[in-house]
Amino acid sequence: MTVRPDIAGQDTPTTVENADITVVGGGGHVGIPLVLAFAEAGLRVNVNDLNQQSLDALKSGRLPFIEYGATDVLAKALANNRLVFSNGSDRISAGGPIVITIGTPVDEFLNPVRKVVQDCIDAMLPSLSDGQLLVLRSTVFPGTTDWLASYLATKGRKLKVAFCPERVVQGFGLKELREMPQIVSGATPQAERDAAALFEQITPEVVVVSPIEAEFAKLFNNAYRYIEFAATNEFYLIAKSAGVDYQRVLMAMKRNYPRAQSIPRPGFAAGPCLVKDTMQLIAFARNQFGLGHAALLVNEGLVLHVIDDLKHRFDLGTMAVGLLGMAFKADIDDVRASLSYKFKKVLSGQARAVYCTDPFVTTDPDLMPLGEVVAMSDLLILCTPHTAYRHADLNGKPVVDIWGHLEGANVIR
C-alpha cells in the first residue's frame, strides 16, 4: 500500500469501488479506531458493518461509543471524503486489503466457535478478487489463520491471509495505534510482507512472527492480565479474612518498589476480551490450563464473596442498595460482560431493592441518575471506579469500595 497524502481535501467522494481498504465490522469497538487511523494516514476507507445505526452515527460525525480523541479525526476524515459507509457482505471493495474485525466467540459450552469466521468469509467471497490481502484482526482460536488459508485454497481462491491482532485498550484505541507496536503475521511470506507494509502506515513498529505465534501472543497477553487481576483479588480476600485492609498492604508493596508496580487494584475484572480469551486458551489446552481455570473461579466468584460479606454486615432484606457503575471498566460506556450486571442479578434476590447508575452508559433504560440512586438507597456499592465518583456527593451513605477508589469515614473496604 502507498500512503495517499494526495487525497487530502479531495473533491471526489470515496466509494466502495475506489476505496483503498475495507474494514469489515468498521463500525464496532475494534473497527472504528482502525478506520480512523487509516483515514488519518491518507487512505480511502470502506467502513463496512451490519449495524446501520452505528454507520448512521459515524456519517453524522458522532461516535456510537466512547473513543477518546477520535471525534476530531472523524470530522476531518468526513470533511476530506476519506470514508464510505456500506452495509452487507456484497459491498466489499474488490481491490485493496480487507481487514476483518470478527473473531471466534465462545459458545455456551465455553468452546470457540470458528464457524462465525467461516460464515463471514463465505458471504464475502463472491465480492473478493484473487490476490487481495485478507487480514484477521480480532482474537481467533490458535490455528485459525492457517486453517483459513487452507479453506480458501479448497475453494479455489488465491487470497493472501494474515493475522494482525488488535491489542489496544478500550476507549483509547486510536491513541494506542499511533504509539504501540502491532503484531503482524501471514500464512505466506507475501501475505506477511503485505500486512507489514499496511500496518507500517499507522504504527511506529511492527513485530513480525508466524500466525500461530501471533495467535498465542494475543491470547497470552489477555490471559496474563486476567490472571494478574485474579492474583490481586485473591490477595484481597485473604487479607479481608484476616481483618486486614488490603489497600494499605498494596500501598506498602508498591511504594517505591519497581517490581510491584504492575500489581493492579482488586475489583470486578471482566469485559469482552479477558474472560473470552482465557476460555479460548483453556479450550485449546484441553482444559489443562490450571491458572486460567483458577483465575475464572476467583474473578467470577468475587461477586459472591462481596455479597456474602454484605449479608453478614447488613440486613440486606430490609435495605435498598445502589450500584455505582455498570460499565465493565472505568470511564467508558461498554457494558459487555460487565460483572456489575452479575452483581445486580445476584443481589436482586437478596436486597429489598437494587438501583443502578452510570455516568457513561446510555444503552440501559433501567439506569437512574446518580442523585436519585443515592437518595433512594440505604447502602451503596462501587462496582466501577469511574473518576467522577471520587468527588461525587454520596450524602454520607455507607459505600462499599473494594477498589480503594474512595476516601471517607463512610467508605467500607
Where are these regions (language model features)?
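Structural/interface elements that position substrates and couple domains in central-metabolism enzymes
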Residues: 2-413
